[in-house]
Amino acid sequence: MSRITGTFAELKRTGKKALVTFITAGDPDLATTEELIPLLAENGADIIELGVPFSDPMADGPTIQLSSERALAAGTTLSRILATVKSVRGRTQVPIVLMGYFNPIFSYGLERFAADAAAAGVDGVLLVDLPPEEAGEFKACADRHGIDVIFLLTPTSDETRIRTVTNRARGFIYYVSVTGVTGVRSGIEASVAGNVNIIKECSKVPVAVGFGIATPEQAGEVAATADGVVVGSAIVKLFEKHRGEELKGALATFVSSLKQAVDRGRYDN
């Protein structure tokens, strides 16, 4: 059982849902990232997504694009991100998912990346531009090294795509709550609950919902149906306003409030 699967199973055993938090690796620098991973876990993050900065982040809105630019300007590379994960493993065992685009992984080498990521303590990888139909070689490498490959479903996914993803899913399925790029939204789409239930009818793999979740109220609303709630842009936006200890305090307060809201969306068991 992977660390991600074990986390969802333990949360479900206690009736709770998962809070998944996203930060960009290397924003403002990797030393700060290494400090923030344990802080996020201590304040309620059950799983942490580390964004791998990329020069052409087509699925990301302005907030995460700017964050990626800051990280790249600070000299962040994939190999340095893996070294950071390996270093932080002495302080926390929270599941870590690398989220990004296929090009940096391809350039690194698929087998080499999977081996190095597993050795560093990476638990999962989500590549937004690698659909399951094209992921065979990469997934085989990841499977050999015990890394969960996480796929996306969207409001426009038809039954064939849903079955394709659910048949290949490991760790969790990431349901994108809106069409378009990442970013804060004013409300949750009415279709989310129904679409999540359709996915869950096809698979026992947990479903986490992300994109556009910005407030504890929205997180709690999504947690009523989903197995997990992903918050990204609203967290990354704090990096625009705060630095140092002030950033740590702002993150701790916000993530704690998100976790309290997610905990209210309990399972019926």
UniProtKB/Swiss-Prot annotation:
Q: In which pathway does it act?
A: Amino-acid biosynthesis; L-tryptophan biosynthesis; L-tryptophan from chorismate: step 5/5
Alphabetic keyword roster: Amino-acid biosynthesis, Aromatic amino acid biosynthesis, Lyase, Tryptophan biosynthesis
What's its catalytic activity? (1S,2R)-1-C-(indol-3-yl)glycerol 3-phosphate + L-serine = D-glyceraldehyde 3-phosphate + L-tryptophan + H2O
Q: Select a single GO molecular function from the record's annotations and give it.
A: tryptophan synthase activity
Q: Is S-adenosyl-L-methionine found in the keyword set? A: no
Query: Do you know which Pfam families this protein is assigned to?
Result: Trp_syntA
Question: What PROSITE patterns does the record point to?
Answer: TRP_SYNTHASE_ALPHA
Record has Phosphoprotein as a keyword: no
Which catalytic residues are annotated?
E49 (proton acceptor), D60 (proton acceptor)
For this protein, the record's InterPro entries field holds: Aldolase_TIM, RibuloseP-bd_barrel, Trp_synthase_alpha_AS, Trp_synthase_suA
GO terms under cellular component: cytosol
> For this protein, what is the EC number?
4.2.1.20
Subunit info?
Tetramer of two alpha and two beta chains.
Membership in a protein family:
Belongs to the TrpA family.
Classification via PANTHER family:
TRYPTOPHAN SYNTHASE ALPHA CHAIN, CHLOROPLASTIC (PTHR43406:SF1), TRYPTOPHAN SYNTHASE, ALPHA CHAIN (PTHR43406)
Q: In UniProt terms, what function does this protein have?
A: The alpha subunit is responsible for the aldol cleavage of indoleglycerol phosphate to indole and glyceraldehyde 3-phosphate.
Identify this protein by name.
Tryptophan synthase alpha chain
- Please report the organism this UniProt entry assigns to the protein: Geobacter metallireducens (strain ATCC 53774 / DSM 7210 / GS-15)
